[in-house]
Amino acid sequence: MTTSTPHKTRSTRDIFNTRFVFLMAAIGSAVGLGNIWRFPYVAYENGGGAFLIPYMVALLTAGIPILWFDLAIGHRFRGSAPLAFRRISSRWEGIGWFKVGVNFFIAIYYAAIIAWAALYTIKSVTQAWGDDPAEYFMGDFLQAEPEATYSGHIVPSILGVMILVWIVCIATLATSINEGIGKLTSIFLPVLAVMFIILVIRAFFLDGAAEGLNAFFTPDWSVLSNPSVWIAAYGQIFFSLSIGFGIMITYASYLKPRTNLTNTGLVTAFALSLIHI
């Protein structure tokens, strides 16, 4: 599937220098909590290794087709989600803004999680959490009340890092697609891959690692008749591939005018699925 773009937008839209840079940006936008944190426990709760069957079905029947759809819209109409949908029909522009709204709320809690991770990276040098990580996280780190479900208390150290995170994000978005997102993802995604490999190797030597691996890779085939397992698989696909959020629409708008979207979508989808497993 190769698409061409409207003539009037070809000279006014920046483009990724290479397909590799686009792939790094696309994969980097999807690799996160949905891959590293959410997928393992969803698989564990839904039959372990057997969950891979509904997951692969969901990938082939929903994930890849919707990813192609996002890529095609962004590439054909050369704009962010609201602009792309408006160019299709003014009545559809609201769909694009809905996607922007979803991403706005995601960015709010992701900034907090990134701040936590950055601070924990520093504190890991001395293992500041000691023998009781849970108590340290809720008490010393978040400074939250034991029974509180919500607190308006501001933790200066976390706030400072969050402000820094937002400054970096805004500065990145203010630069060109290649000098900003393209360059950063091309550098930090390989770094993430190395860190992830180290984390996995470290996890193999933790107490209970063998039991966890056995639980994950021992399939419970009986769950395949449970509709909730299939619903969980299809839900996971949206987290895993970052589809339906308008992100891939925007990224695809920066692809070269003549691009093989079929191959690009397949590489992106299967690369992300490999990371999960």
Task: Locate each region found by the language model.
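Inter-helical loop and helix-membrane interface segments of multi-pass membrane transporters/permeases
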Residues: 10-13, 42-46, 81-98, 113-174, ...
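Transmembrane helix-boundary motif of multi-pass solute transporters/channels
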Residues: 18-58, 211, 247-255, 264-266, ...
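Membrane-interface "cap" regions at the ends of multi-pass membrane proteins
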Residues: 1-37, 66-71, 75-87, 94-98, ...
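Conserved small/polar residues in nucleotide/adenosyl-binding loops
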Residues: 276-277
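Helix-loop junctions at the membrane interface of multi-pass solute transporters
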Residues: 13, 40-43, 170-176, 232, ...
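Helix-loop-helix hairpins and the membrane-proximal interhelical loops
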Residues: 2-6, 11, 185-241
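Extracellular loop-to-transmembrane helix junctions
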Residues: 43-69, 95, 157
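Hydrophobic core segments of alpha-helical transmembrane domains in multi-pass membrane transport
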Residues: 58-62, 102-108, 114-122, 161-174, ...
